[in-house]
Amino acid sequence: MQIDGFKVDGIANIERANLRIEDLCALIAPNGYGKSNVLRAIEFGVKFISAEEAERRQMLSGRWMSINTATYGKDFSFEMAGRINMNGEEQQFVYSYQLAWASEGSEGRVVAESLKMKRSTDQRYRQLINRAETDNCLIVPSAAGRCNKPFDVPSNLLALSAIARSAGMFLNGVASQIYGIQVPNLETLDNPESYFSVGGGKGIEILGGMTLSEYLYRLKTEDEGNYAILVDGLMQLIPNMEEFSPEVVSLPGGQQIYDVRIKEKYCARPTTIAQLSSGSKRMIFLFTLCIAARRQSVPMIMLEEPENSVHPRMIENLLLTMQNYAEDTKILMTSHSPYLMRYLKPSQMYFGLPKNDGLAHFAQVDPSKLKYLYKYAGDLELTFGEYMFDFMLDVEDDSEMMEKYFIQQ
């Protein structure tokens, strides 16, 4: 399973966010602009696919409905494009749906839904699910069939979800793969100190609810191959670290506590990871999340501001190491750091356009304008990312500049 892109609209302060996902991508904007809302919108869209009845009702209740005057009450739209393997052959898919939020006297419901697929040799997509209205859903019943068989499905349930739960249906194999997609929005804004707490600390969902220290110990004792990969990556990330050893201590009464012992260069003996710098702990935290996603074949993870607490000189190494070791897991992150931007390609960056309308508008630089921006950056002896950080401040309230240099969605 691979994810190639998302489109989201009509949630929080998001209007028409269209993201093409590379191995590593970043949403770049000032604080309070809406970067986190884009991640939450994607999380919401993926989560609704596999949500149970009570959770669907709660999600449709309108908590995330846009209250911006320009988009108030607008339906939520979600589209996900990617590739899945069917019978040994890779196929492209585009799955989308639209939800009407619950309002006074009206329950939330599915308004529209579509699933299209094609093989790499096909010119056109084949329609597999076509739900033009809440109560009007058509599906493909067989390999040779057309998308013309009526399919009854409750108003607040996606047809794809119903098919994934029905083992005997023709589309079950396709639907089950999309239904099972995980795109975790990881809590990387938190101080990593709590995740390494010897006394227990906070469990993390992608780590099976374990603390980081316990997960690292389980990895060491149960998955030697991935543990070796993790240690190799950490030694590259933190050159002063000479030894890395997750440990368990059994206490009277059967209780166990977990710790990670670190031996640093110039230190006479190992110490607990709690004594490591915040930046080093954060790099261990982020890299472990990437390894966990890799082990579970998670197609994409979302991270908030990975540069926090990390020295600017270490950011490039952190990005490269995370990207290389995550393998097929793509990374979508948020950032407001010019130091991080200097290590990204233009195709990896989505900039928040300062249109001052309360909505989050994210766009990429128009490829035809890159040569001019690179020249301007070179004249000032800046990297492209550094120049763009200042450029975004200059285009505020200048709609002509935004239209000239950015792809309009």
Q: What residue ranges belong to the model's regions?
A:
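ABC ATPase nucleotide-binding domain "signature" loop
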Residues: 29, 305-310
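Electropositive, glycine-dotted interaction segments
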Residues: 89-236
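Extended helical coiled-coil dimerization/tether regions that scaffold
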Residues: 205-273, 393-394
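C-terminal lobe/lid and adjacent interdomain/linker elements of RecA-like ASCE P-loop ATPase modules
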Residues: 316-409
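Conserved P-loop NTP-binding catalytic core
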Residues: 39-107
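Phosphate-binding glycine-rich loops of NTP-binding sites
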Residues: 21-63, 283-289, 337
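N-terminal pre-Walker A segment at the start of P-loop NTPase domains
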Residues: 1-15
